[in-house]
């Protein structure tokens, strides 16, 4: 396992990134509600729904893509999809584009998870798989804790002019 520590560290970093992106959705919801003036809160519920439906849709096709093209191209596409989704929303910041963007980002996250699960088994070794899987979940947990804090910092400290106290329970707590 010593010769694969670098690759295993890279895989753990990927899990961190996946969790960071996935878990920043929660703190964003109140700001999205106020930013888009959503009066029907069910509309806000569509945001994570679109994100996670993409997981369900893309998991099996991602496995087929891995079998056909290999891990590297699917891993690259898995990182490219969130980039594309983010750029699309930045260029057209509308509610429908937000939903489409969340869906595209979710597709990428599903591709990444589908690549990383078997890859961490191969890199960490069959005999160490339980440890490696738990280490991946630990990294996932750390990122899920840190991502709202980073969002809080960005909103409160970097742009105090537009920050409105009391609008977001995640930021104000």
Can you annotate each of these PLM segments?
Residues 130-155:
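Glycine-rich segments within core transmembrane alpha-helices of 12-TM secondary carriers
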């Amino acid at each position: 396992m010593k010769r694969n520590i670098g690759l295993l560290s890279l895989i753990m970093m990927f899990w961190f990134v996946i969790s960071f992106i996935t878990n920043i959705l929660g703190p964003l919801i109140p700001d999205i509600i106020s930013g888009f003036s959503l009066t029907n809160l069910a509309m806000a519920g569509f945001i994570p729904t679109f994100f996670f439906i993409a997981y369900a849709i893309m998991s099996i096709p991602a496995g087929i893509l891995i079998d056909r093209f290999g891990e590297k191209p699917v891993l690259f596409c898995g990182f490219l999809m969130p980039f594309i989704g983010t750029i699309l929303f930045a260029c057209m910041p509308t509610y429908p584009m937000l939903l489409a963007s969340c869906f595209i980002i979710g597709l990428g996250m599903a591709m990444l998870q589908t690549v990383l699960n078997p890859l961490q088994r191969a890199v960490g070794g069959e005999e160490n798989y339980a440890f490696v899987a738990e280490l991946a979940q630990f990294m996932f947990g750390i990122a899920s804790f840190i991502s709202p804090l980073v969002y809080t910092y960005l909103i409160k400290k970097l742009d105090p002019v537009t920050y409105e106290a009391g609008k977001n329970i995640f930021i104000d707590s």
